[in-house]
Amino acid sequence: MTATMDNNKLHYKFLFLLSTVYLAIDLNVQGFLSLMPFIREEFQITRAQAGLYFTCYFLIATIIAIFSGRIADTIGSKKGTVFGIIAVGALFILHSFAPYFFLILILAFLTGLAFSIITPSLNKAVMDKVTRKNRATSMGIIQMGGSVGGFLGASLLPLLAENFGWRMGIVISGFLAIGVGLLISRFYREENSNRGQRNDAGYTRLTFSDSFKILIQNRQLLIVCGLGLALGTSIGAIPAHYTMYVTQDLNTSRTIAGFSLGILQIGGMVGRPGWGWISDKFLHGSRIRGLILVGGSLALVTLLFSIFITRYNPSLLLIYIASFILGIIAMGWMGLFFTTVAELVSPTLTGIGTGFALVFTRTGAVISPPVFGYIADVYGSYSYSWMAMSLVVFILTLVFIVTSGQLTSRTPGKQPYDHESS
């Protein structure tokens, strides 16, 4: 592959190969979350305690996100990706041996540590090899693998759990992740590119502290990251609680709840390349207008879950349709968001810039699951949990609209760093 890909086409082999990484990650993570009704039953835990799993998973990944991004910039995308995915697979296999729930939380903490390097590594791979014309779409295609994995995990692992126990299901998914790591090691060819470095040569010699100072002085990046905090609540609370919400508030079986989570992931599979495609093709490359559309849509759909879906005993068909729409919005924004972030930093700071943004999105993901579950425990229903999320997203989207004026005033399609070859 050339250092810079052709503007006029998407290179699907490259994109689909890297998408298998997110497929394996979400097959394990979302699949494990779909097993929460089984795990709650075995360990006799509350909804708030169940929500702590996702918090522990993202906690260490949030704390060290910037350092992980720096590592990705240093060792390259291939080594970071291979190490991360194999370690995640091995740790999920260890989940199956845990006799107590607190040990599962410790393993979630360690799994998040291994996962922390994967997103910066994959984002760096895309920014190094894909030109701006199709970058948001390409990032979405890679992220789409996560939705495929999430659907497979949420649909298949509960079936395995019903027949063989939840521990056997997580062993199988863990070995699959290790297999993907070996696949990436064999077939992904990383190229060292000097693209963008002639205009950015000074950045290649920066220390970690100097790089961090540049990021926190980037007001445009901070504005986008502020919205990322709100969007992060959706990827934390919703998948962590969705099967419990569908079983308890909507009175369905655990298998139907797992399938609903799978449909949520299918929606995310459509949304991840979809939002990027809308930005690339219909918004003339305007990432900011795309993010405003995502934030407004998320506030609206979570409000509808609060005042309509939860309270009026929807049919099974409506549950599936609502799950799909929620997935498009709540689980589909990542490709567009991280493309925006990467285009706001120097090409040589893509990894650490991604890590910086992950601090914000993962903070939302860490805080939201226990809060979402606590509100449901207090009121005996998830209705007020959905309402709280809608309010938070609405307020931070309004703040983003007000403060992002200087970004939208730029020449359409231009960002501080275009990551293009000279």
Task: Provide a role label for each language-model segment.
Residues 74-84, 281-296:
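Cytoplasmic membrane-interface "Motif A"-like loop-to-helix N-cap segments
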Residues 107-148:
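Cytoplasmic helix-loop-helix junction between adjacent transmembrane helices
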Residues 2-9, 191-223:
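Juxtamembrane intracellular "pre-TM" segments in multi-pass secondary transporters
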Residues 142-190:
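Helix-loop-helix hairpin linking two adjacent transmembrane segments in secondary transporters
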Residues 30, 58-66, 150-151, 265-269, ...:
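Residue-level signature of mid-helix packing/kink "hotspots" within the transmembrane helices
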Residues 32-33, 220-273:
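Extracytoplasmic gate region of multi-pass secondary transporters
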Residues 285-337:
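C-terminal transmembrane helical hairpin of 12-TM major facilitator-type secondary transporters
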Residues 63-99:
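Conserved MFS/SLC helix-loop-helix module at the cytosolic interface between two early adjacent transmembrane helices
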